[in-house]
Amino acid sequence: MVREEVAGSTQTLQWKCVESRVDSKRLYYGRFILSPLRKGQADTVGIALRRALLGEIEGTCITRAKFGSVPHEYSTIAGIEESVQEILLNLKEIVLRSNLYGVRDASICVKGPRYITAQDIILPPSVEIVDTAQPIANLTEPIDFCIDLQIKRDRGYQTELRKNYQDGSYPIDAVSMPVRNVNYSIFSCGNGNEKHEILFLEIWTNGSLTPKEALYEASRNLIDLFLPFLHAEEEGASFEENKNRFTPPLFTFQKRLTNLKKNKKGIPLNCIFIDQLELTSRTYNCLKRANIHTLLDLLSKTEEDLLRIDSFRMEDRKHIWDTLEKHLPIDLLKNKLSF
């Protein structure tokens, strides 16, 4: 982080992209500006965005590779220049672009002699290779070479215990981080008591998404994180009503639904978030992956819609129904969900 003094003027808060370039297929760069900010706000925004960009953006990676009869990852395969470990490292570097959730299968099946590149990977329709020229292996002899792959969308750095698999399957330590680096600098402007700050944000990505897309997703994640605090007034928890209480009332799912059934001021269904339903972490994650964030989103889905969600099971369906049945009018449930 860099802080400098520059001349500037006071305007309505706004942001824009001041520089954008593509250095290579796997290196995009963007520079953004946000101004004017009061003293201290630039640091607050810069720190939050940097952490969200580096840790909260999801990416798609190859997470597992299955060879034929290979005793361990340091083995060599006749007719292939690289060892199994080198092939795994090359697969780890492949950059993919997709919006898929859950695990997907892919494969490579070629005949040598020839170079194998990312272009030779047979992918599901929802996945795209960013740089098809990325190397994987070099077949030096006329042999048939096949690899079964698993692809997964996740965030952060995923590691698995190293061990030999009898079926020739090996995990790959996936780096699901589309944003390669983030830097921000702060510039002070104005004179006397009219000083303001300008935030410059630099973003480098691996090509699976643009810096602008990454900034949008990080901002969306931060907004979602703070959304529950924006509905405090809807709970009727005003300061005057609670100033003598030691602990403020919790914004629980049960209380929201009680207000809903009393049909008083009516809490909108889109203001009740699924993280307040006290669901299991498994059921909650399934719904989030399907972009179901509120009770309105959930009640808009049919049973068939839910069962089409990746990894969603009948047990999850029953768990959701049991939770809603205890709190919502049965007529509403019958109209919305055909469980």
Curated annotation (Swiss-Prot):
GO terms for molecular function: DNA binding; DNA-directed RNA polymerase activity; protein dimerization activity. Disulfide bonds: none annotated. GO terms for biological process: DNA-templated transcription. It is an enzyme of class 2 (transferase). Residues 264-339 are annotated as: Alpha C-terminal domain (alpha-CTD). It comes from the Eukaryota. Its EC number is 2.7.7.6. Residues 10-233 are annotated as: Alpha N-terminal domain (alpha-NTD). The keyword Plastid applies. It is found in: Plastid, Chloroplast. Keywords: Chloroplast, DNA-directed RNA polymerase, Nucleotidyltransferase, Plastid, Transcription, Transferase. GO terms for cellular component: chloroplast; DNA-directed RNA polymerase complex; mitochondrion. It catalyses: RNA(n) + a ribonucleoside 5'-triphosphate = RNA(n+1) + diphosphate. NCBIfam families: rpoA (TIGR02027). In plastids the minimal PEP RNA polymerase catalytic core is composed of four subunits: alpha, beta, beta', and beta''. When a (nuclear-encoded) sigma factor is associated with the core the holoenzyme is formed, which can initiate transcription. DNA-dependent RNA polymerase catalyzes the transcription of DNA into RNA using the four ribonucleoside triphosphates as substrates. The N-terminal domain is essential for RNAP assembly and basal transcription, whereas the C-terminal domain is involved in interaction with transcriptional regulators and with upstream promoter elements. Belongs to the RNA polymerase alpha chain family. This is DNA-directed RNA polymerase subunit alpha. It comes from Triticum aestivum. The gene is rpoA.
